[in-house]
């Protein structure tokens, strides 16, 4: 059964605490720049571990030192609590890995 979609207020409240994150056509998106390519790739491995633990899997792209991340709940057709929680986790992981949110 699909998870209920988050309300606009829930999304706005979460985004207020997630620097660099934005809502875009039913997805939460962010781009992080890292000191090196190796640091960017290592960050994706931490995302993979967190996603596996949450059983919720975002998409990401590595562009040299920049990692673009997007999360949505496909079964529900938009942003759910799963995405808000995963965004919070990814945000904390990026801070720990010295990722800097940048315009995507």
Where are these regions (language model features)?
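Long, contiguous binding/interaction regions
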Residues: 1-104
């Amino acid at each position: 059964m699909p998870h209920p979609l988050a309300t606009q207020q829930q999304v706005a409240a979460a985004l207020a605490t997630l620097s660099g994150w934005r809502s875009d056509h039913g997805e939460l998106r962010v781009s992080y720049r890292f000191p090196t390519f190796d640091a960017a790739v290592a960050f994706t491995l931490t995302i993979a571990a967190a996603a596996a633990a949450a059983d919720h899997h975002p998409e990401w792209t590595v562009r040299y030192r920049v990692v673009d991340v997007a999360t949505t709940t496909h079964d529900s057709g938009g942003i759910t609590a799963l995405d808000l929680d995963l965004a919070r986790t990814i945000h904390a992981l990026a801070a720990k890995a010295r990722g800097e949110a940048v315009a995507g």
